[in-house]
C-alpha cells in the first residue's frame, strides 16, 4: 500500500497522522509513505525527524474579513493543487488521507480530482474550515466525536476515534508513577496545561498549593518548560508540601497518564482521545483562545456523558480547582462512575479502525 498523508499547522493535526503511519507500518511493513506539509509549519521539522519522506507546498488560510490576502490565498490554493498533482503522480498513492490544517486543502482536493481514494480525519467536535470544504469531494470522513458527524454528509461519516489513543495503551502505570516520584498506594491527580503550559492554570495552582498540602492525595503538577522557573519562584515563597510534585515537562506522558487516578487539563482533541481510551476521569479547563471555541465543545461531549467536569477559565480559582478535584477523588463512587463513563467513550484501537477504512477504500 502506498499512502500519501497531509496535515499540518498544529501538533493536533500532525501527531495523529504520525500515529496512524506507525500503526500501518506495524500491520503492513511493506507500506510506503509520503507526507505533504508546508515549508515553515511545525510538520516541516517534526516529520523529517521520523524518517518519513516529506514534500512541501505553499498555502495559507482564508481571513474571516474580506481582504486582498484572500485573493492571494486563492492563487496559492490553485498553485498548491498543481504542485500536489505533480507529487501525487510521481508517488502514485493507493490512498490519500488529510488530518487537518490548511495544507490538506489542495493536497486532498487534487487527489480526489485525480480519482484516488481519499479520507479526511477530523479530530475535534467542531470541524475546521478545510475539512468542511473537503468533505464534498472525499470518499470518507473519519470523526472522533459524535457531535462532529452532523457537520458532514452522513453517508461519508465513519467513527474511528483518534489514532493517538492507540499509543497510550499497554503502558506500565506503576512504572510511570515511580518515574515522577508519586507513591503507589495513594490516589493522585495530574494537572497540566498542554506541552507549553498555561499561565491561568499555573496561577490557580500556586494559589492552591498550601491547601493541597492538607490533602490525602498526591498532586503532580506540570508547569510547561517556559513557566517552570516563575512557578518555582512563587512556590518557594509559599512552601512546597510533601504531597505536591512539580515538573517542567514529562517525557513519558502515556505511562504517567496510565498511573494517575484523575487528570486536570485543557480539552484538546488528542488529550481527550488519550484520556477516554484509558478510562481516566478528568476536570477539563478548555482553552478559550482556540478557533471556534472548539475545546469547550470537545469538553462538552465528554462532560455530557459523565466522564468529566468542565471548569471554564473565567471561573478558575484555587477554590474551584480544589473543589472539583475533591468531588471526584474523595468520593469513591463518583470516581468509579466517571472511570466507567470515560472508558465507554474511548476508542483504544482508533488507529486500527482508520486503517481498516483505508483498506476497504483501496480494495473497492
Curated annotation (Swiss-Prot):
Sorted UniProt keywords: Cell cycle, Cell division, Cell membrane, Cell shape, Cell wall biogenesis/degradation, Glycosyltransferase, Membrane, Peptidoglycan synthesis, Transferase
Pathway terms, separated by semicolons: Cell wall biogenesis; peptidoglycan biosynthesis
Membrane topology (UniProt): Peripheral membrane protein
EC numbers: 2.4.1.227
Residue numbers binding UDP-N-acetyl-alpha-D-glucosamine: 10-12, 124, 195, 250, 295
Transmembrane segments: none
Enzyme class: transferase
GO biological process: carbohydrate metabolic process; cell division; cell wall organization; lipid glycosylation; peptidoglycan biosynthetic process; regulation of cell shape
Pfam family, one: Glyco_tran_28_C
Cellular location(s): Cell membrane
Keyword Cell cycle listed: yes
A GO molecular-function descriptor: undecaprenyldiphospho-muramoylpentapeptide beta-N-acetylglucosaminyltransferase activity
Gene3D superfamilies: Glycogen Phosphorylase B (3.40.50.2000)
InterPro entries per record: GlcNAc_MurG, Glyco_trans_28_C, GlycoTrans_28_N
Principal location class: membrane
Catalytic activity: di-trans,octa-cis-undecaprenyl diphospho-N-acetyl-alpha-D-muramoyl-L-alanyl-D-glutamyl-meso-2,6-diaminopimeloyl-D-alanyl-D-alanine + UDP-N-acetyl-alpha-D-glucosamine = di-trans,octa-cis-undecaprenyl diphospho-[N-acetyl-alpha-D-glucosaminyl-(1->4)]-N-acetyl-alpha-D-muramoyl-L-alanyl-D-glutamyl-meso-2,6-diaminopimeloyl-D-alanyl-D-alanine + UDP + H(+)
Cellular component GO terms held in the UniProt record: plasma membrane
Role played: Cell wall formation. Catalyzes the transfer of a GlcNAc subunit on undecaprenyl-pyrophosphoryl-MurNAc-pentapeptide (lipid intermediate I) to form undecaprenyl-pyrophosphoryl-MurNAc-(pentapeptide)GlcNAc (lipid intermediate II).
Family statement drawn from the similarity comment of this UniProt entry: Belongs to the glycosyltransferase 28 family. MurG subfamily.
Name listed for the protein in its UniProt record: UDP-N-acetylglucosamine--N-acetylmuramyl-(pentapeptide) pyrophosphoryl-undecaprenol N-acetylglucosamine transferase 1
Source organism of the structure: Bacillus thuringiensis subsp. konkukian (strain 97-27)
